[in-house]
């Protein structure tokens, strides 16, 4: 079905915390341009999976492969580099209140050591795609909850990552803003970005098929 190798893979992955098994025997792969949903109830281990994929947590057993590399044994510098290569839309994500919306969005591009001019131009394009171009000079506290989340999505996508990780990104939004956010994530997938979303709800982006990975009894224990 796919001519290219997976963008990332979980191979027989398990996680134990304080001698309690939280995940076990988790195996799946994701390919370029897929919109994937990691579906499960609160406490099922969705965030643990995202933490492993972004290098914030090591699996107790099994392998996590990203772009052909086994990341289990990455050192801290390699883990930071891995996270910088991804777009992260995580729970508890923050915008800096002493910076404008535009300045917040361009931060990843500046960290990637791009020229400020190029970073600024990319940030404006990202804001335009997310419908926030007119709000670029505002401070985060002047935005609605939905606008803040869209600004964080613009920041996640500003470096044109191959992979966007999203942890319950629409959990605090009303139905209209939630659908807007999901549709924008779908647009990233249409452009070839792999979107990996963890949620207890099943999103329905327009014009994009969602592949669902269920965190059920075969992959976790509570």
Regions found by a protein language model. Name each.
Residues 156-157:
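ABC ATPase C-loop
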Residues 139-143, 147:
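Conserved ABC ATPase signature
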Residues 70, 106, 117-135:
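Conserved ABC ATPase "signature" region
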Residues 62-71:
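Conserved ABC transporter NBD signature motif
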Residues 54:
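Helix-to-loop junction immediately C-terminal to a conserved catalytic motif
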Residues 160:
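Conserved catalytic motifs of ABC-family nucleotide-binding domains
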Residues 71-87:
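ABC ATPase NBD coupling module
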Residues 164-167:
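Catalytic Walker B motif of ABC-type/P-loop ATPase nucleotide-binding domains
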């Amino acid at each position: 079905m796919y001519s290219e190798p997976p963008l990332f893979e979980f191979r027989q992955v398990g996680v134990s915390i304080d001698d309690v098994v939280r995940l076990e025997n988790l195996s799946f792969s994701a390919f370029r341009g897929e919109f994937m949903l990691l579906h499960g109830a609160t406490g099922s281990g969705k965030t643990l999976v995202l933490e492993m994929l972004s290098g914030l947590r090591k699996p107790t057993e099994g392998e996590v492969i990203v772009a052909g590399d086994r990341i289990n044994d990455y050192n801290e510098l390699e883990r930071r580099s891995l996270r910088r290569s991804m777009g992260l839309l995580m729970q508890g994500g923050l915008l800096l209140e002493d910076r404008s919306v535009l300045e917040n969005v361009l931060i990843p591009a500046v960290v990637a050591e791009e020229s400020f001019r190029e970073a600024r131009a990319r940030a404006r394009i990202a804001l335009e795609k997310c419908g926030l171009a007119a709000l670029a000079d505002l401070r985060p506290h002047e935005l609605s909850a939905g606008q803040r989340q869209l600004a964080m999505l613009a920041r996640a996508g500003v470096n044109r990552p191959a992979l966007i990780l999203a942890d319950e990104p629409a959990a605090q939004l009303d139905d209209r803003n939630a659908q807007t956010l999901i549709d924008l994530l779908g647009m990233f997938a249409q452009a070839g970005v792999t979107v990996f979303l963890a949620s207890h709800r099943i999103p329905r982006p327009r014009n994009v098929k969602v592949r669902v990975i269920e965190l059920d009894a075969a992959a976790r224990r509570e």
